[in-house]
Amino acid sequence: MTTSPPPPPSSPSPSSPTPASGTPAHAKPLRRLTARGRGEAHRAASPLELFFDLCFVVAIAQAGMQLVHSVAESHTGEGILNYAMVFFAIWWAWMNFTWFASAYDNDDVLYRVVTLIQIAGVLVLAAGVSQAFEDHDFLAVVVGYVIMRLALTAQWLRVARSTEGPERAMALRYAGGVALCQIGWLGLLFLPDGGKPWLFLVMALLEMCVPVYAEKDHPTSWHPHHIAERYGLFTIIVLGETIAAATIAVKVGMEENDALDELLPIAAGGLLIIFSAWWIYFVVPIHGRLRSSKEAFQWGYGHYLVFASAAAIGAGLEVAVEQTVGEAHVSTLTASAAVTLPTALYLLTVWALHSRHFKVGLAQQAVLPVTALLVICCTFLGDWAVLAAGLVSALAVATGTTLTARMAAREQGPRSATQTV
């Protein structure tokens, strides 16, 4: 989102925890919050970051559950709108923490405490998701979001205190931008229901402009491999939550309605979709593409659709189960679309962010877009829609793997011949 060149790789500051350090990270309770090196070796996600992710998935699960209820009660449009707004709050807070931690995580006591406050904020948000969907009462959602954002503001103020020059100015712009945006979010509490989506749209755009403004002169020193790992781990956790939600729905349907025969196609198709979603996301390493702030931010922002669609697949599978056993007041077409449309969106987004940068030739490039189109067509197959979508997704994985293997074999042939000569 910004064309500023990334800063040159720097050595980790003395205050930063590094694998080579013989001093435990918690030995000094308070340390200066300075940038870690972009070229730092063996950088990996920390236990605190993994704990952070797991707590955020609690909020995602609540949003998915309410989306199921909305669609099952034929309030699809309203449910999707509320889901988009709540998911943005969860995703944006997660994303900002992730990039901040990649650049400045020093794992001291104060850093941990402020991060735990952010976790508390997302749990407050999660507690208010049902009221936001059912009563249009966003009080708990806004309060939880503001808690997370003000905690991040405090972290940026720590950076400003620990640095100087352009880096300090960048930190102050971040702190000021994030804090000012919270005033706008509080307006959601006072607007009538019809005005809330419009204010949300404005505030979401303003929030996403803060990094562009803050890093215009001095980009943060995020770590490409660490960022790619963090996004990958969160994708795994979201897909895991999707499997858990769908499994519970199938289990309840079998126990309460004795509908094993009717639910087997949904269960099998759902597993194939989720397995394929995992395979497609991780088929190629992406950290090599994150060479500049512009590329990295576009990639990071695009993951709103990746995460939201991945979680929505699970919600769609629950709707399909409820419709099959007669507990959802929607048609088979609507229930099928609840699975196929987020699946198609996931495939297209992963192709746009990942696959298209590595695929060679028209055949390889066309696999995921064509698969997305075929998955949408599966919507009209009635009770077999989910199974068909799963088979199409699995076929895409098989096709992509075969094409890649054939290209590798063709490239290996001339190389071997050259070596022989």
Predicted regions and their residues:
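Short, hydrophobic transmembrane alpha-helix segments
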Residues: 64-79, 102, 131-132
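Intrinsically disordered, low-complexity terminal tails and inter-domain linkers enriched
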Residues: 4-26
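Intrinsically disordered, low-complexity coil segments
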Residues: 13-16, 71-78, 254-261
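Generic low-polarity alpha-helical segments
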Residues: 1, 12-16, 388, 393-398
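Loop-to-transmembrane alpha-helix initiation sites
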Residues: 194-199, 382-393
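Alpha-helical transmembrane segments of multi-pass membrane proteins
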Residues: 54-69, 378-379
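Predominantly late transmembrane helices and immediately cytosolic-facing juxtamembrane segments
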Residues: 3, 22-50, 55, 83-113, ...
